[in-house]
Amino acid sequence: MGEVKIFDTTLRDGEQSPGVSLIPEEKLAIAKQLARMKVDVIEAGFPISSPGDFEAVQIISENIRDVEVAALARSRKKDIDRAWEALRNGGDPRIHVFIATSPIHMKYKLKLSEEQVIEKAVEAVKYASKYTSNIEFSAEDASRSQPVFLYRLFERVINAGAKVINIPDTVGYAIPEEFGKLIRDIKENVSNIDKVDISVHCHNDLGLAVANSLAAVENGANQIEVAVNGIGERAGNTALEEIIMALYTRKDFYNIGINQDTTQIARLSKLVSNLTGMTIQPNKAIVGANAFAHESGIHQDGVIKERTTYEIMDARTIGLKDNKLVLGKHSGRHAFREFIQKLGYDIDDETFEEIFIEFKKLADKKKNITHVEIEALIDNHYHTFDKVYELDYLSVNTGNKVLPTATIKLKKENNIIEKAACSGDGPVDAIFQAINEIVGIDDIKLISYHINAVTEGKDALGEVIVKTKIEDNTYTGHSAMTDITEASALAYLETINKFLTSEQTRQTTSAQEGI
C-alpha cells in the first residue's frame, strides 16, 4: 500500500481568502492543531510579503518540531534569504520556490522566454540549496503550461537539487481526466522524476479541486496540497478534510495509506472557521452541520436500524461526539480538567482557570452542559493575545419605542475604567458605538456580523463572529455565551485588541502572488 503526504497551506494560500487576516498567535494555534492531526508539512507563510508573515513563519518553525514547516519564496535571492531567515531555527525546514510557466504568464507577467524561466528556476533551487536540501519547486499555472516545456524544466530543477516537484492547477482550469494525464505524462517523460516526490496544488474555480487531486493520486502523485475547509483565493483550494476522508473511506479503491489522525478534523475545521470568520456552509462535505443529518423518514428509519444503510462514514471518525449531557453546576475543577483532557485539549493552568470560571457562570444559567458548549467556551480562550481593553460592565436599554442605548465600562491595561454611553440603530450597534467612543479609533468599519446557535433550546449558547476593518487591515473576533449582547461586545472588542497589540503590517505587497 502506498502513502500520500498531506501538505497544508491554510496559513499561506488559505489566508489569501478575501477578508481573512490572521495574527501570528492565531496562526500558531492553527499550526498546533495541524500538528496534532499529524499533517506532513505546514506551509506557514510567505515571509517576504509582510513583517506579519515573517513573524508567523518564524514562530511556527520554532514551536512546531514534529512536522516539516515550509515557507514560500519566488525565484529570487532576496525571497529565499528572507524565507530561510524565518525558517532557520526549525526542525526540518522546507523552502518552497516557484515561478510561472504558462505562456500567458511568461509573456505578460514575467516577460521572459522559456529558457530564461528555466535558468531562473535552476538558479533559485541551487541558491536555496546552500541553506537546506529540503527544497520544493512549483511551476505556477502548470495546468496551462506546455507539457514538453514542463518536462525540460522539471528535469533541470531536479538536477539542481529539488526534492519535491509541485504541479499546480493555479486557476482551477483543469478537469480530472486531463489533469491525471498530465501527472502520468510527467512521470513518463521526466527521466529523473523517480528522485522526487510529485505534489499537486489544485484550486476550486470549477469545483473540481478534490476530484483533480484524487485523479493525480491515481496517476502517481504522492503529495497533495490542501487547506482546511477548502479556503483560499477566489473559490478556494483542495479541502483537507475531503481529501483525507476520501482516501480513508475509499482505501479499498485507492490502496493508499494516510498517517493523519482523522479524529482531529472537526476541531480543526471549527478552529479555522472561528479564527478566519469564514462560516462553514451547512451542506459542506465532512464538516458541515448537515453532513451527518437525515431529514427523510426513510433515511432516518434506515440509520436507526443500521447506520451504514445511509452513512458511509462514522461521525466519530472525524471527532464528532454524541451531544450527551456531561457536566453541571456541581462539577469540580478535577472533573472539568479531566474532561477537557479527554477532549484532547492541552491548556495551561492560567487559561484553565479562566475557562473554569466561564463554565461555572454558564452552569448557573443552564442545568445541563454538553461537550459542544464546553468546546465553545474553550474556543473563547484557546487562542491568546494581549488584551489592551477588557469588558467590565455592560447595560443595554432597547425596545420598539425606545432609542437603543448601551452603557459600557472597559478596563484598560493599567486598570483605569473608562465609561461611555451611546445610542445606535439597534442594541448591537449601540454597543459598538460605545466601545468606539472609549477606544478612540476613528477608522474602524464593521465588515460582517454573524450569530450561530451552538446548541438547541431557549438557553442555547450563542456564538458571535465579528469581522472589522481597521486602517486597511481585517480582524476577526469570536465569543460564545448565553447572552448574545455580551458575546457581541466581547467579539467586537477582540478585533480591537488584536489591532492594538498587532505589531505587524497586514497590507498586501506586490510580492503576494500565489501558486
Curated annotation (Swiss-Prot):
Chief site of localization: cytoplasm
GO biological process: L-leucine biosynthetic process
Chain intervals for the UniProt region annotation (Regulatory domain): 390-515
PROSITE patterns: AIPM_HOMOCIT_SYNTH_1 (PS00815), AIPM_HOMOCIT_SYNTH_2 (PS00816), PYR_CT (PS50991)
EC number(s) from the headed UniProt entry: 2.3.3.13
InterPro entries: 2-IPM_HCS-like, 2-isopropylmalate_synth_dimer, AIPM/Hcit_synth_CS, Aldolase_TIM, LeuA/HCS_post-cat, LeuA_allosteric_dom_sf, LeuA_bact_synth, PYR_CT
Catalytic activity: 3-methyl-2-oxobutanoate + acetyl-CoA + H2O = (2S)-2-isopropylmalate + CoA + H(+)
Residues given in the record as Mn(2+) binding sites: 13, 201, 203, 237
Protein purpose: Catalyzes the condensation of the acetyl group of acetyl-CoA with 3-methyl-2-oxobutanoate (2-ketoisovalerate) to form 3-carboxy-3-hydroxy-4-methylpentanoate (2-isopropylmalate).
Subunit structure: Homodimer.
Name by which UniProt lists this protein: 2-isopropylmalate synthase
Gene encoding the protein: leuA
